[in-house]
Regions:
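Active-site rim/loop-helix segments in enzyme catalytic domains that contact anionic ligands
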Residues: 167-238
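Conserved phosphate- and dinucleotide-binding cores of soluble alpha/beta proteins
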Residues: 1, 5-165
């Protein structure tokens, strides 16, 4: 039950109207399952798609065509246009599930979930749906505030790894090296609780600095003279 993509150009508008009518005849969509493109498109609702858009022909964005190249044996073979359900058509579904995996989707997942509704990122419209859920793995959700910087939004259960992440983030945010961070930096960036655990910035900065140096110089701790099994390449290397 998808729009026909091979109808003659002169028949596209009629086909789109038939598709919309078939949805209404079926009583609407109970569950709409979506992916999300790097540009934030859902379906093929590329940047600029309005919230009132319906099933229609649309020109494909360069990024979308490039991402689809592997499925068409080269970018030159990817169609330049497609027929897509509109944003309004999608939003009428009773439930919506958005599925994303991989670190290459992290930036757009953050924008779709936490950014303001924006015609340039169609997925942001889903924030306005009463029953839409994003299903993401750790990699694609890594940039979400609740994962990347949970101390910004609430209480945190601190451990050594999270402390190191927080101090590195603080250095990046303030533009300072780790050893130059002071108490005010911690207080002004939602890290008062972390500062309270250590009393002063200096000792904490030193611990994190030493941990980073140990990682850089810790090659002697890597396996040596042992057999290593590589199960698969990185999923983004295909």
């Amino acid at each position: 039950h998808i729009p026909k993509g091979d109808v003659p150009r002169d028949d596209v508008e009629e086909e789109c109207e038939k598709y919309e009518a078939s949805i209404k005849k079926a009583g609407g969509i109970d569950l709409q399952i979506l992916g999300i493109g790097k540009t934030g498109h859902i379906g093929f609702n590329e940047p600029g798609s309005g919230s009132d858009s319906r099933t229609r022909r649309i020109a494909l964005d360069t990024v979308t065509r490039r991402d689809a190249a592997a499925d068409f044996f080269g970018e030159d073979n990817v169609p330049t246009e497609a027929i897509t359900m509109g944003v309004a058509t999608i939003m009428e579904a009773r439930e919506i599930a958005i599925v994303a995996t991989g670190e290459h989707k992290a930036a757009i997942i953050k924008r779709a979930v936490e950014g303001e509704p924006d015609p340039d990122v169609a997925a942001t419209y889903l924030q306005q749906h009463p029953n839409a859920v994003f299903y993401v793995d750790f990699a694609s959700g890594a940039d979400l505030t609740r994962i990347r910087t949970p101390w910004v939004i609430g209480e945190v259960k601190w451990n050594r790894e999270r402390e190191i992440d927080a101090v590195i983030w603080l250095g990046e945010t303030t533009g300072k090296s780790v050893l130059k961070l002071d108490e005010n930096d911690y207080r002004e960036h939602h890290l008062s609780a972390l500062l309270a655990r250590h009393g002063k910035a200096g000792p904490l900065n030193g611990e994190v600095f030493n941990a980073l140096i140990a990682k850089i110089r810790g090659r002697s701790k890597l396996p040596a003279g042992k057999k290593v099994v590589v199960f698969s390449p990185h999923p983004d290397d295909d």
